[in-house]
Design a protein with these regions (language model features):
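ATP/NTP phosphate-donor binding region
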Residues: 1-57
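Glycine-rich beta-strand-to-loop/alpha-helix junction loops that act as flexible
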Residues: 4, 60-62, 84-86
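ATP/nucleoside-binding phosphotransfer catalytic cores, i.e., glycine-rich phosphate-binding loops
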Residues: 12, 177-183, 208, 218-245
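Catalytic core of DAGKc-family lipid kinases
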Residues: 35, 74-188
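Short Gly/Thr/Asp-enriched flexible loops that form oxyanion-binding sites at enzyme active sites
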Residues: 65-77
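Glycine-rich phosphate/pyrophosphate-binding beta-alpha loops
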Residues: 131, 135, 190-204
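Gly/Ser/Thr-rich active-site loops/lids in small-molecule metabolic enzymes
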Residues: 146-156, 199-200, 205-225
């Protein structure tokens, strides 16, 4: 399942010839399906997963494409999901050493499936991190900046951060976690199955995607002058040492 508009290049033009070559070498029975609109990956994955017999779905795109394919495959025991990262952030594969192993299609085809945790929410299945607050505002702003020429990948994230910190900061939250109620004014909240998001921000350095646990990261409301340092620490995974986290 290929998202042709993932990242800054035409993923279908780059990937499809490689997929055909790798699949032919492995003598696979396969289909190449291109997404045509947001959410189409869910529909395509679900349609394939509902057919009889085992199926492995390769999400070829960014983290958004992977999320759609997982949502479509979720609940079907016959379906496996793999990832071919060609998006702008590719944070999912950072949990497993980066993009390089996942771009070796021959090894990926031969690889064995392993169990992985997902996050179940009232909006459906999530893969790595669910967030609210400043980081969520940043995520909403990213598509606008990606449309600017030469503004892909981490640059779009950084420009969206600048826009978000120029507006109102902080939210009053009431959180129930492990039978404990937490109330306060927070800059952001991240519920983490994986360790990174936002193009490499290391939100939960110790998060593991197959240990059965979620890590809850809370950042208290702080002033704008402190945010620059927080963002630097957050990107490196050093924010857990601060008093406001």
């Amino acid at each position: 399942i290929v998202n042709p508009v993932s990242g800054k290049a035409d993923a279908s033009g780059l990937l499809v010839p490689r997929i055909i070559q790798a699949a032919a070498q492995q003598h696979l029975n396969y289909q190449i399906l291109l997404t045509e609109k947001p959410g189409h990956g869910v529909e395509l994955a679900q349609r394939q997963a509902e057919q009889e017999g085992p199926v492995r779905l390769y999400a070829c795109g960014g983290d958004g494409t992977l999320n759609e394919v997982l949502r479509g495959a979720y609940g079907h025991a016959n379906a496996q999901v793999a990832c071919v990262p060609c998006g702008s952030g590719n944070d999912f594969v950072r949990n497993f050493g980066g993009s390089a192993p996942f771009l070796n299609l021959e090894d990926l085809i031969q690889g064995e499936a392993v169990p992985m945790d997902l996050i179940e929410t009232d909006q459906g299945i999530a893969v790595a991190i669910c967030s609210a607050g400043l980081d969520a505002q940043v995520a909403y702003g990213i598509p606008k900046f990606r449309r600017i020429p030469l503004c892909g990948g981490s640059m779009a994230y950084k420009l969206s951060i600048l826009q978000a910190v120029s507006g109102p900061l902080g939210h009053r939250l009431r959180i129930c976690a492990d039978d404990e109620i937490i109330t306060g004014d927070f800059l952001m909240l991240a519920l983490c199955n994986g360790s990174t998001y936002g193009g490499g921000f290391l939100a939960a350095p110790h998060a593991c995607m197959n240990d059965g646990f979620l890590e809850l990261i809370l950042v208290r409301k702080i002033g704008r002058l402190q945010i620059a340092r927080l963002i630097g620490d957050y990107q490196k995974g050093l924010h857990m040492q601060g008093d406001q986290v």
